[in-house]
Structure formats: C-alpha cells, structure tokens
Amino acid sequence: MRTPIVFAATLLLLAGSTFAQEYVEFKSQQDRFSIVFPAQPKITETTYTSEFKSVLPARVYSVDQGQSHFKVTVVDYTNIQAIAAEKAKACPPGAEACSGNTGSGSSTGAGYWKPDIEGAVIHATWELMQRPNEKPLYLGWTNMNLVEGHMVNLVNEKNKSRTSAAIYMHENKLYIIEGTVPAGYPVPDFFQQSVGWLDANGRDIRYLTIYHNGFPKPEVRTQGGAQGGYR
C-alpha cells in the first residue's frame, strides 16, 4: 500500500511549515530500507529490549526540527535465538516463564525466542499505545509494497501533538516508524507512508503477494521491473 497522490498532496500541504524545507530520500543499505526524511537523519547505535527481555542490537535514524520529530528504529532479530538462549542460562532452576522450553515441539524455545520474534510487531505496537498522555485514534493492518504491518495514529492529550506510526517486520528486522508534529499541523502520515524496501544490491523492491516474516518469501519486482526470486 503506497499512495503517491496522497503522499504528494501532503508534501504540498507541509511546504509552508518550518520542517518542510528540504526533503531527503534516504536509503540505508545496511538496514535495507528507504524513506523520505525532512533532512539527513542522525544515526545512533543502541539496544532494544524485546517483550521477553532479550536485549537486541538496534539502530535509530532520526531528524528533529523544532517541535517536529521523525524517527525510524530498526531492531535486528536475526540472532534472537542465540541471544535468548544465553539469557536463559541466568534463569533460576525451574523458572519456565524465564527459561522457556527447548523441547522439539515447544512453542517458546529457549528464553522465549519464538514468541519474541513472532510477536515483535504486536509488542512494538502495544508499547507505542502505552506511552504517557498518548491517546490512540486509529489502529489497523497495513502494508507497504506488500510487507504487512500495523499503522497507529496517536494524539497527545496534553499538548495535542499528533503522531503517525507504522510497524513492520522484514527479513527478521523490526521497523518502528514514527512522525510527530505539533498541534495544528497536518498529520504526518507522509513519513511512514514513504518507506520502501531494498534488496542486497540496493534496488527498490515490491513483493507480488503479501510478505509475512518467517514464511517463504514471495516473488518480487525490482525497481527496473524485472521479476524473479528475491536474492
């Protein structure tokens, strides 16, 4: 789901605002995404604590202009199994809720790594909705270039600022995309709606059917229009 007409119209509405001075189509080959920022983002290495308390490597791309804030947090779940298993070693004996179950038919795995990765989008969505003074106005399913995710709109009940966010899981990486603007500004849907996905060669891709993380990847169409298996 990518709406170029709505996106372009929103940019025109924002053209007179203080943060809409120079738009940058930013691409991260390292994290395989593209997005339109209002300026070159600052990149910060950090960590992210998952629902079941595994500490994962993360990277934050951010732009702050006045009271407007734009941010993409990318959390790498690639090594969640090993990280959770290491965490589980410190659990008290018999504390299954901490250590998980390593049996072949277990739904948890060591340190609950299985529900951690499967529920990453839901957990990140819940965390957004639990922020102090933030009231959810909308929560729904969405997709961007056929990668499925959640879309959330929030209003701050104190200062009336608006946040438009989207959360996706692609290639075992969690993407939390947030745009926040002051009261009276157009809702910044344009930011999360401008996200795209890159292949190993840095080309923009669009899946031909819905992409579900953890399932076999659908065929893709690259920027040049060629079709074929994802490489």
Where do the model's predicted regions map?
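Positively charged n-region of N-terminal signal peptides that target proteins for export
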Residues: 1-4
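N-terminal "mature-domain start" segment
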Residues: 20-58, 136, 144-146, 202-228
